[in-house]
Structure formats: C-alpha cells, structure tokens
UniProtKB/Swiss-Prot annotation:
Tissue occurrence: Nacreous layer of shell.
Protein name: Uncharacterized protein IMPP7
Superkingdom of origin: Eukaryota
Lineage of the organism: Eukaryota, Metazoa, Spiralia, Lophotrochozoa, Mollusca
Amino acid sequence: TFVSSQVSGPR
C-alpha cells in the first residue's frame, strides 16, 4: 500500500 512507501521512505 502507499502507507508502506510513506514509512519506508524517510526511514
């Protein structure tokens, strides 16, 4: 989901 990308992005 887009949430995974949002979390994995900055992390």
